[in-house]
Design a protein with these regions (language model features):
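Noncatalytic, typically N-terminal accessory segments of nucleic acid-processing enzymes
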Residues: 1-239
Length: 239
């Protein structure tokens, strides 16, 4: 099961606190995004971690930031009836963007860069016009934005499980695990298309058997504790 409304509100406050540790500006910008989610005429149901998806499978010589990979994921989500929001750092919403793929060759005294082609620029502009692209201000931590989206019951699409954030945002590791299982879908992109998958609710299957004494024994994992719970049910025989 996912987090309760009260727990989601607590996570939201944890995100604001995390942003404020960087600067008051970061907190103010995240609060603006919170207002955007709350007041937008659409009720978004999915949020895509843009950079994570765009760089998927790009750690090779010639790899680059690929907005069309984001589009492929957006198309799948919209086909399933989702109202989709894409979060991207502002530096990726311009005609020339950084290239942070693993094998990008930095230019002298600056980051490697790439120029988006006309199709990619038009794609970003189309999302902007539809109100489904949010440019995260420079120097702000973009992970906090898509995580915040999940507190409004959005399904997040990212292969980044935000493990670096749970200690400052979630009350416990168990709460973080429940959030991750319920709110974050991983993504794979191949020539065959896009595959979205969420981890199962339980990491282990339940087990049940009937003992020789006529008792039903059910064993199931306790989600928060990572332990196993055994229940013995004894059926009274008719005399």
């Amino acid at each position: 099961a996912g987090l309760t409304t009260t727990e989601l509100a607590s996570v939201r406050e944890g995100l604001f606190d995390a942003a404020s540790q960087s600067s008051e500006r970061d907190k103010n910008e995240l609060e603006k995004f919170d207002g955007f989610l709350r007041d937008h005429p659409w009720r978004f149901t999915a949020v895509v971690d843009g950079p994570n998806v765009a760089y998927l499978n790009q750690n090779y010589d010639g790899g680059r930031f690929r907005p069309l990979q984001i589009k492929a994921v957006v198309d799948v989500l919209e086909a399933r009836g989702h109202r989709v929001l894409v979060t991207l750092p502002a530096k990726y919403c311009e005609a020339v963007v950084p290239n942070h793929s693993k094998f990008a060759t930095p230019l002298p005294s600056q980051e490697a860069e790439q120029a988006l082609d006309e199709e990619e620029i038009a794609l970003l502009e189309a999302w902007r016009m539809r109100g489904m692209l949010y440019a995260v201000p420079r120097a702000c931590h973009d992970d906090l934005y898509w995580i915040l989206g999940t507190t409004y019951n959005c399904l997040a699409v990212s292969n980044d499980r935000a493990r670096d954030h749970w200690t400052g945002v979630f009350d416990s590791e168990a709460q973080y695990r429940r959030w991750s299982r319920a709110a974050v879908a991983s993504v794979a992109i191949s020539p065959d298309g896009v595959e979205l998958s969420s981890p199962p609710v339980h990491e282990h299957a339940s087990f049940a058997s009937i003992s020789s004494e006529g008792a039903s024994i059910a064993v199931a994992p306790e989600e928060d504790a990572g332990e196993w719970l055994r229940v013995d049910v004894v059926f009274k025989q008719n005399e």
